[in-house]
């Protein structure tokens, strides 16, 4: 597998609609204000987080169970700045909709701007032929409240192209998160 360059990413966007909407260059300023960057980079794509968040809460005294997940574990917010409580967690989603080619696996890494503040972004790999908005997991590892800025960069996606086509893609096996929109909760 090889990591793919900005040139390849642009071609995949043009020919296969791999990322929509797509920023062809790094965007660092919006309305004359500095922002956390997003857009195409040398060997990846920095995606933005939307203003749709689900923040973990303890007010309902529920238990987090991945096999039987309760929406009562979360509070919904549509905000420009999401404040994650100390040592807590929030879910968001990308503004961008991804459509992954059959011979590509995508991994996600966090942005150093957030990591240096104790905010970790986690995303599982985007498998061949998966498509949808990516649900982002934000963990505030600090003892202080932390801010996540909607409509700004949140993470970077790296595209790994295989020299072989997989026998079974995510679409072939009808994966449960296929074509997800919005923040998607755990499914079993």
Curated annotation (Swiss-Prot):
It is an enzyme of class 3 (hydrolase). It catalyses: dCTP + H2O + H(+) = dUTP + NH4(+). GO terms for molecular function: dCTP deaminase activity; nucleotide binding. Its EC number is 3.5.4.13. Pathway: Pyrimidine metabolism; dUMP biosynthesis; dUMP from dCTP (dUTP route): step 1/2. DCTP binds at residues 111-116, 135-137, 156, 170, 179-180. Keywords: Hydrolase, Nucleotide metabolism, Nucleotide-binding. InterPro entries: dCTP_deaminase, dUTPase-like_sf, dUTPase_trimeric. CDD domains: trimeric_dUTPase. GO terms for biological process: dUMP biosynthetic process; dUTP biosynthetic process. Gene3D superfamilies: 2.70.40.10. Pfam families: DCD. The keyword Hydrolase applies. The active site is at 137 (proton donor/acceptor). Belongs to the dCTP deaminase family. Catalyzes the deamination of dCTP to dUTP. Homotrimer. This is dCTP deaminase. It comes from Rickettsia felis (strain ATCC VR-1525 / URRWXCal2).
